[in-house]
Amino acid sequence: MNILILSASTGGGHMRASKAIENYMIQQGENINVEIVDSLLYISPILNKTITSGYLYLATKTPKLYGKLYDLTNKEHKLANFVARLNNIFANKLMPLIEDFKPDVIITTHPFPTEMVSRLKVKGEINIPLICIMTDYAPHKAWISKDIDAYIVSNDDMVGKMVNEGVN
């Protein structure tokens, strides 16, 4: 079984979660092949550096601004729509990876690749089960996308919140 784990190195928790999933899956059997890919780095090293350094700067130097941007992207707003459009554009750049690796399932631990893979499914470009591991403690609109086959959340309190966001 080929398992593709897509994440991003904004902060540290998303990639650590990916590594923990990889370790667990490998222990489950001999015929399991796991590939972890930093989706932003794969798409563009420049994009990766811009987003990760921007995130680090905002989170550490201007946390109030980071909080404001976080809130704006969690509702219908021009910024949230802009990020969604970018993810739609970048989604196609994941296709060579998906075609080469031929995953039986795709697991995501970051909202950007979650939305990208979801877009590929919506457009009918792939028909691969997509599992989203939400590494945050509360749902954010960036994590909620169409055609996600399963969500795994960090705590029971999130289940009701996810239902309120339209996830069934």
Annotated model-derived regions:
Residues 109-112:
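Short His-centered aromatic/hydrophobic patch
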Residues 123-168:
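Active-site-proximal region of nucleotide-activated glycan assembly enzymes
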Residues 20, 24-95:
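Conserved N-terminal ligand/cofactor-binding loop architecture of enzyme catalytic domains
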Residues 1-4:
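Extreme N-terminal starter segment of soluble prokaryotic enzymes
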Residues 44, 114-116, 140-141, 159:
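Short, well-ordered alpha-helical microsegments
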Residues 6-8, 37, 133:
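Short hydrophobic segments within beta-strands
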Residues 8-17:
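A short, glycine/small-residue-rich beta-strand->loop->alpha-helix junction that serves as a flexible
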Residues 98, 102-104:
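Proline-aspartate-enriched helix->loop->beta-strand connector
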